[in-house]
């Protein structure tokens, strides 16, 4: 039975197990008639109404485009990796943080007076020249009257000195020491700045480090000279001989229990001097708070005497305090809080734990992927990383390290004796560092997890006027120190949790893969009312489109080759003498068209009156019939007795 007969009998053509459609029209008709996507069948059922067909086609394509536009928005939102912040409040006992207090004075003046006497004397001369300053009229002792000023100065005053500058950074050639008929720029209405000149090693490239205030300029200039002096002194000699904690902390207790030597560690800060960290968690078990309130925290009585302060470097009286986590270094100059003399300062704390997402969700790190060597003995901290990065850059480009930062291995601090142009190099780098041109802030990302303490401070006069006498008397006898200035030499500090509720803030992905698929499914159902299997049908349609395209291309190529072969066959019938050569060329082209043509020379058939032959039928003994035609036998496999009528009806064989 032929295919047409099967189609006529069954009403539908039988589909093969693996087969494709012959044209795009058949493919789209089958898809529109059988798909579960809404609206597609309308395009086929309305094919006799062109207006409906066009309308439903436009509607389908428009809806399809809007849906995929929504898909694009959803994918854009997903790949932006948004996060949600979750806040929770918990109540439990709290580990007390580390508390660091510093004296606000790098050295007691009587300890370093020998090293700084010449610098202080020269500073007084500068003040006298620029501002007509006389320390004797202020009731202070002049540093130039000290016998320690004799000898060679430890700094090069001709290299860098304070100068008044106009808007063009031109030095003001103003009064000199002892001049009585000259005037200072500060008496003029014209604006002048004050600063000092910095040059490179050759002296060819120079710039002025200027300030609008003479106080700021003098402190920065003095600090620069102070570094040049102290950096030349071995670190062992820099240790103050009078470094007992009792000279700074008169009393200490936590939860109404006295502190011990195991509860604190000491270190020296280059600007703030002796610093003591309580509850650092290294030498003893960390403190814990079970009850909130000012009476259940850390209480310190501090000495804040100002008589032994460095006059040109320590311009603030009191002490400095910083509350920080145990595994973080104290950066007193960045986050500290000053304590006033004669005042009781109460600092209430509330703990916060922050947890961020890294990777594609945020630019945070745990420090393992940071390429900056941490110069601080602590866990990863952004401030420590930034300072370490800046110090490494200074060492690399200036050949020495900045005195206020820890040193990398094998480096030494900058000073005139080691690098005369280090100031020029440092201030140039600092400007680039502040503008983030060195890349330190980009390299040092914020940590993914850290603990923060929100603080509120309250102040009150301490001791009061009626209790000042007996409190200072007791403190003087207990610490064997004569307090001549009363409450101006002492201060009290309280650090406590004002509540044991602590807040946890965490980030979580707000648009996950599940959310994306859910939203895309909602959009698909909204615009087409379909399911996941409908998406599979769309994928099948795309695959069939590709397959039909390949079939159509191969069919066209075959037809082109067939047309070429037919034209060459006609040429063969008229050029018999060259048949051999043409057959060879045709064979080459037929191979390219995936066809083989066999050409044979045959003799013309004999002329007969009729093509009907009467051939006797011979039956074999086994009841098989044999017909003899042109000396060739054709065997019939069916028994003769079973089909007599059929054999008779067949009649003669026609060739």
Swiss-Prot record:
Originally identified and characterized by its inhibition by the diuretic drug amiloride. One of its GO terms (molecular function) is ligand-gated sodium channel activity. One of its GO terms (cellular component) is cytoplasm. The chain crosses the membrane at residues 56-76, 532-552. It catalyses: Na(+)(in) = Na(+)(out). It comes from the Eukaryota. InterPro entries: ENaC, ENaC_chordates, ENaC_CS. It holds the Pfam family ASC. Residues 1-55, 553-655 are cytoplasmic. Its main location: membrane. Residues 562-586 have a biased composition (Polar residues). Belongs to the amiloride-sensitive sodium channel (TC 1.A.6) family. SCNN1A subfamily. This is one of the three pore-forming subunits of the heterotrimeric epithelial sodium channel (ENaC), a critical regulator of sodium balance and fluid homeostasis. ENaC operates in epithelial tissues, where it mediates the electrodiffusion of sodium ions from extracellular fluid through the apical membrane of cells, with water following osmotically. This is Epithelial sodium channel subunit alpha. It comes from Neoceratodus forsteri (Australian lungfish).
